[in-house]
Amino acid sequence: MEIIKDLTQRGILKDVTNLEKFQNIDKDAKIYSGFDPTAISLHLGNYIQILTLLRLKKAGIKTLAIVGGATGTIGDPTFRSTERIQLSNDEVNKNKMNIIKQLESFGIEVFDNLKFYENMNILDFLREVGSSINVAYMLNKDSIAKRLENGLSFTEFSYTIIQGW
């Protein structure tokens, strides 16, 4: 697949869990990239994500930008030594709407991950999602393991579950 060669040569694609599967990607599959609404606008750090989505789209692969309307209310613990200051729901929503508008201006399909959770209560979540989560696996993730020594809130621990489901 020419797009894989292109992304590899550009240094964008480095590690792929299953290269053969990626090379034979189903035409109905989608590749997504996540955007965190903790800032009012997209920033330079998002540039590679956007260009990669556009390159994949141009190569005929369906792409999707997922904006974290749900995960943005929690805050990503990755690469943090302390817990993020939580934004108000209004701030997250304002940021999310701005970022969605910016992504759509590139012609990128956008999905808000809040749609997965907005009508789900905690008991439904634990039954539907919690029963399939391996806590030992999560504790071994670098983003979690590094924070355990200094303290990690349940909110931050749950971020990975909400992001991944």
Summary of predicted features, one role per range:
Residues 1-165:
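NTP-dependent nucleotidyl-transfer catalytic core
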